[in-house]
Amino acid sequence: MANFYTDNPSLKVHLTHPMMKKIVELKERDFADADKFDYAPQNFDDAMDSYDKVLEIVGEICGDIIAENAEDVDHNGPRVENGRVVYAEGTKKNLDACRKAGLMGMSMPRRLGGLNFPITPYIMAADIVSRADAGFENLWGLQDCAETIYEFASDEQKEKYIPRVCAGETMSMDLTEPDAGSDLQSVMLKASQKEDGSWVVNGVKRFITNGDSDIHLVLARSEEGSKDGRGLSMFIYDKRNGGVTVRRIENKMGIKGSPTCELVYKDAPVELVGSRRMGLIKYVMALMNGARLGIAAQSVGLSEAAYREALAYAKDRRQFGKAIIDFPAVAEILSLMKAKLDASRTLLYACSRFVDMYKIYDDIAKERKLEPEEKAEQK
């Protein structure tokens, strides 16, 4: 049985970095959850053992299920039926395995149904999933949209939506439009407030990854007459309420298991997140900063898969009576690939640890005033 965690010793090297002790102790608030949840760690060693065991489960699922389904998923892909996305059979099996293993909402607090993982081991899981199937990582990795709900939504919204994500419901970030790709301040999806104070949105979004998800974060124009980013707000759309249909799925060159959708909104009911006008300049910026780590993990995971494929081929392919890996030119290519892979992974986890420190202190600051040395560490 393949295990994409245990067969890659470099992952454990990064998991046991000395900085993790500080991160874990802060994240666990000196292990205050130990008396409240039977699966909460008692101390640092217990926490690290928990991360290690969960990553072993991720590695096993990736090696035995997700990687085995990857070719079929990429060949068949999802389809649209009656305005809804139907995942490929392999994708359904992948999601089912992750749900049963409790691998959704990994970084969310235990009180909301999550595992309370720091960002670093969560990104490590994303690295492993990406090696198995980068397309599935696009779906599974969107669970980190819950971070935005946790950071900026009301307590009522947190309690309403985050437990659903932790239970296995999927998410998407509905940002781009036909005339607003990289230039998000040009977004024109219209958000209208009704007399009773509720909101509805109307318009079209395009290139939305996993666009038929259960819970959407939607960027829309809430301020009549505005034309720039200061007129945009963020909303939550719940698929259960209806009002959004999938017009089509884009025919991409790769990662076809991930449905990239065009969405049509017709009086779709939504909930405002945080404050009006802050959708792009604050909430989306925070959302995309987290997404960048996920995409970096996806790139590293893909690089790992490519390197292993190249190495296996070089050992198997024979010319002039010997394996081509024995030719200095080929060996040099492989050595350079490995060096770049190791450097990329090192940079990824160094960044993840700093993000952990920033986010944890940001969360602590909601509970109490940070000490001067803590503010310095956060920076």
Question: Where do the model's predicted regions map?
Answer:
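Flexible, glycine/threonine-enriched loop-and-boundary segments that flank and lead into catalytic domains
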Residues: 81-108, 172-196, 200, 206-215, ...
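A glycine-rich, basic-preceded beta-loop-alpha segment at the flavin cofactor/substrate interface
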Residues: 36-39, 240-243, 247, 259-291, ...
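Short Gly/Pro-enriched turn/cap motifs at secondary-structure boundaries
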Residues: 179-182, 207-209, 226, 252-259
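A short core secondary-structure module
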Residues: 198, 202-244
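Internal maturation/activation junctions in enzymes
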Residues: 141-142, 153-189, 352, 360-375
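Amphipathic, small/basic residue-rich leader segments at the start of a protein or domain
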Residues: 1-136, 156, 160, 360-377
